[in-house]
From Swiss-Prot:
SMART domains cross-referenced by the UniProt entry: H2A
Subunit structure: The nucleosome is a histone octamer containing two molecules each of H2A, H2B, H3 and H4 assembled in one H3-H4 heterotetramer and two H2A-H2B heterodimers. The octamer wraps approximately 147 bp of DNA. H2A or its variant H2A.Z forms a heterodimer with H2B. H2A.Z associates with the VPS72/SWC2 subunit of the SWR1 chromatin remodeling complex. Also interacts with RBP1/DNA-directed RNA polymerase II largest subunit.
One Gene Ontology cellular component: nucleosome
Identification of the protein by name: Histone H2A.Z
Pfam families from the UniProt entry: Histone (PF00125), Histone_H2A_C (PF16211)
Gene3D superfamilies assigned: Histone, subunit A
Compartments it resides in: Nucleus; Chromosome
InterPro entries: Histone-fold (IPR009072), Histone_H2A (IPR002119), Histone_H2A/H2B/H3 (IPR007125), Histone_H2A_C (IPR032454)
Record keywords, A-Z: Acetylation, Chromosome, DNA-binding, Nucleosome core, Nucleus
Keyword Nucleus: yes
PTM comment: Acetylated once deposited into chromatin.
Matching SUPFAM superfamilies: Histone-fold
Length: 142
């Protein structure tokens, strides 16, 4: 025993279970949480944008990242469906506009103006009734 308590193994202690494998590969916070968006970058932005040098926990950054990823996936899925309905393969700002304004919850959440998004197609019911009445009158006369 060379100057210390315990066993003298001559090297680093095992510190737990020993397996035949080498050291574990490093995993990012995003990989551990099963996310595609970068947790480290979101944490950095949270730290930069807080007042009075507040601390930001790692779990808070993971949670915010998960929420951002979910909302992005939801919007892209709806926009992809809108693009597919119009038989095109590229999502444009118009498709994003149709997707967001077509979903009631996303519409209340995202109140921003989307550049080149256009307007939603809408015809007042009073105008539709007049057109339908004219068609009926033509059918009766014929």
């Amino acid at each position: 025993m060379a100057g210390g308590k315990g066993k003298s193994s001559g090297g680093k202690s095992s510190g737990g279970k020993t397996s035949g494998e080498g050291p574990k590969k490093q995993q990012s916070h995003s990989a551990r949480a099963g996310l595609q968006f970068p947790c480290g970058r979101v944490k950095r932005f949270l730290k930069q944008n807080t007042q009075n040098k507040m601390r930001v926990g790692a779990k808070a950054a993971v949670y915010v990242t998960a929420v951002l990823e979910y909302l992005t996936a939801e919007v892209l899925e709806l926009a992809g469906n809108a693009a597919k309905d119009l038989k095109v393969k590229r999502i444009t700002p118009r498709h994003l506009q149709l997707a967001i304004r077509g979903d009631e919850e996303l519409d209340t959440l995202i109140r921003a103006t989307i550049a080149f998004g256009g307007v939603l197609p809408h015809i007042n019911r009073a105008l539709l009734l007049k057109v339908e009445q004219k068609k009926k009158n033509k059918q009766i006369e014929a």
